[in-house]
Amino acid sequence: MECYKCGVSGCHLKITCSAEEKFCYKWRDKISNERWLGCAKTCTEENTWRVYNSCCTTNLCNP
């Protein structure tokens, strides 16, 4: 599977996940608006006053 990952030029870098990594995630700090994207072995969706995290299981589904 491939997911987007944050790198030097922003969050558009495409990476190939390892065999154990079954999820793409998108994590955002609602206060600072910082975000991180990448691959994960496990993923828990979260939407609180501070953090938003979404998980998905198809290629490049975390833009």
Swiss-Prot record:
Compartments, as annotated in UniProt: Secreted
Alphabetized SUPFAM superfamilies for the sequence: Snake toxin-like
Tissue specificity remark: Expressed by the venom gland.
A GO term for molecular function: toxin activity
Any one GO cellular component localisation term in the record: extracellular region
Modification after translation (UniProt): Contains 5 disulfide bonds.
Modified residues (Proline amide): 63
Disulfide bonds: 3-24, 6-11, 17-39, 43-55, 56-61
Keyword annotations from UniProtKB, A to Z: Amidation, Disulfide bond, Neurotoxin, Presynaptic neurotoxin, Secreted, Toxin
Domain of life according to the entry: Eukaryota
Primary location recorded for the protein, binned into one broad class: secreted
Pfam families the record matches: Toxin_TOLIP
Family that this chain belongs to: Belongs to the three-finger toxin family. Ancestral subfamily. Orphan group XIX sub-subfamily.
Function of the molecule: Unknown. In vitro, this toxin activates sperm motility when tested on OF1 male mice.
This protein's name: Actiflagelin
Organism from which the protein derives: Walterinnesia aegyptia (Desert black snake)
